[in-house]
Amino acid sequence: MARAGAPEVIRAAQKDEYYLGGLRSAAGEALHSLAGAKKWLEWRKEIELLSDIAYFGLTTIAGYQTLGEEYVGIIQVDPSQQRVPSRLRRAALVALHAVLPYLLDKALLPLEQELQADGDAPRASQGSLLPGGRSRSGARRWVRHHAATLTEQQRKALQRAVFILRQGFACLHRLHVAWFYIHGTFYHLAKRLAGITYLRTRRLPGEDQKARTSYGLLGLISLLHLVLSMGLRLYSFRQKQRARKEWRLHRNLSHRRSSLEDRAVCRTPLCTLCLEERRHSTATPCGHLFCWECITEWCNTKTECPLCREKFPPQKLVYLRHYR
C-alpha cells in the first residue's frame, strides 16, 4: 500500500465534515425542540462537541474507518507506517482535534470580551450580549473578578496577548493547510501532533502528477494570501486600538466638561418660576426663594407658594438684600 495523496485525504475530510454537519444539525434540532431556543443557544457549542466525540468515538477510537476514510479507501497508520495507531494514540487524536479547540475557545473568548469591555459599559449589561445568560457561569465570573484587578497597563498587555493567541491559532491552521497542499502529508494539525498518517488501499482514477502540481500551486497561493491577510489584520487591530484610545479620551473630556458645567449651574442660583438666574431674591414665609418680579406676579393671581402650596398674603414676602 502506498501513502495516500492530498486528493484522497481532502475528499475524506470533506466527507467526514458532511456527516458531522448532519449529526450536529440533528442533535441541535433535538435540543431545540425539547428545551427551546434559549437552551439551544446556550448549549450549541457543547452539542457540537458531543456530536464530534460521538462520531469519532464510534469510528476512530473504536478502531474503524470513518465514513470519509472508507469512502476514498484510506486507513490510518502510526509513524512506522506499518501498524494501525494504538487506542491511546487514536484517543489523543480525537482530543486534539475536537476537545482542545473547544477548550481554547471557551477560555480565550470570555477573557477577550472582558478585556475589551474595559469598564466602558456596566458589568450587568454585558451578560445581555451573550446567549442564554452564559455570563453567570463560574468561569466567566472568575475571569471577570481577576480582570477587574488588573491595571490599565496589564490589561492592555493581556489584551494584546489574547489577540495574538486567537489570531495566531487561526493563522497556524491556515499555514498548516497551505503546507499540506505543498507536501500532502498532514491535513489536520491534530494528526501531525499525534503522528498519524494515511495509506491508501486502492488507487482513485484520475490522480496523476498534474494534480499534485496543482495542489502545490494552491499551497503557494494560500501562503501569499495568508501573509496579506495577516498584515491587514494587524493593521486593523492597530486602528481599533487607536480608535478605542481616542474614544476613551473624548469620553473623559466630555465627562469633565459636563461636570464643570454642572458645577457652574449649581453655583448659579435659579428661580424655579422663570428657570433663569435668580434676581432680587425674595423669600416666602415657607422659606422658598424666587425672583422679586416672578413671585409678585404670581401672588397677583394665587396667594400661595408655587412649590409647596402654602397659603400666605403678599405682604409676607421678604426681599433679601445682598443675597444671591
Swiss-Prot record:
Transmembrane parts of this sequence: 6-35, 37-58, 88-120, 146-183, 215-234
Protein localization: Peroxisome membrane
Any single GO CC term annotated in Swiss-Prot or TrEMBL for this entry: peroxisomal membrane
Activity: how regulated: The E3 ubiquitin-protein ligase activity is stimulated by PEX12.
SMART domains (alphabetical): RING
Pathway terms, separated by semicolons: Protein modification; protein ubiquitination
Membrane topology: Multi-pass membrane protein
Topological domain spans for side Cytoplasmic: 36, 121-145, 235-324
Binding site for Zn(2+) 2: 286, 288, 305, 308
Binding-site residues for Zn(2+) 1, renumbered to this chain: 271, 274, 291, 294
Keywords linked to the UniProt accession: Membrane, Metal-binding, Peroxisome, Peroxisome biogenesis, Protein transport, Transferase, Transmembrane, Transmembrane helix, Transport, Ubl conjugation pathway, Zinc, Zinc-finger
GO biological process, one term: protein polyubiquitination
PANTHER family tied to this protein: PEROXISOME ASSEMBLY PROTEIN 10, PEROXISOME BIOGENESIS FACTOR 10
Function: E3 ubiquitin-protein ligase component of a retrotranslocation channel required for peroxisome organization by mediating export of the PEX5 receptor from peroxisomes to the cytosol, thereby promoting PEX5 recycling. The retrotranslocation channel is composed of PEX2, PEX10 and PEX12; each subunit contributing transmembrane segments that coassemble into an open channel that specifically allows the passage of PEX5 through the peroxisomal membrane. PEX10 also regulates PEX5 recycling by acting as a E3 ubiquitin-protein ligase.
Quaternary structure annotation from Swiss-Prot or TrEMBL: Component of the PEX2-PEX10-PEX12 retrotranslocation channel, composed of PEX2, PEX10 and PEX12. Interacts with PEX19.
Name this protein carries in UniProt: Peroxisome biogenesis factor 10
Species name: Mus musculus (Mouse)
